[in-house]
Amino acid sequence: MAVVEILDISLTETVSARLRGRYLRAVPGTLNTAHTMEITGWVLGRECSAVAVELVNKCNVCLRAPVNIHSPDAAAIYPGVTEAAYSGFSLNISVLGLTPEIEFLVQAVLKDQNRVLIGVIRARRLWRLRSA
C-alpha cells in the first residue's frame, strides 16, 4: 500500500508586515494512504486580505485553494478581525509524479496578488506492507 508520510513542517514567523497570523494543521509523522496529502489551516492578511493559499513544488504552483472556510479558532484568537471567522483553507493534493522526497512551499495569496510564505512542508512517498 502506498502512503505519504509528513516529515516536517517549518512555519514562518507569525508577525510580519503582510500577515497577521497563520496556522497549518498538517502534523509530522502523519501517514496518508494512497498518494495524497491533506493540508488545512487558516491565514489572515494584515492590511490586505488573504484570498487563496498555494502549494508550490520546484517553482511550480501545484494547487491553489480559496481562503473561505469557517475557522472558529482564528476568530477566537482575533475577535476584532472580521475576516478571521472565514479564514480557513483546505488543500488535498495528489503527489503522483513527484519525486519520493517532496517539499512544498505553502504561500498565501493576498487580495493585491502578492504572495507571502506561510511555511514549508517536507514529506516522502513510501510503500507499506499490509498487515495480515
Predicted regions and their residues:
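Basic, ligand-binding patches in group-transfer machinery
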Residues: M1-A132
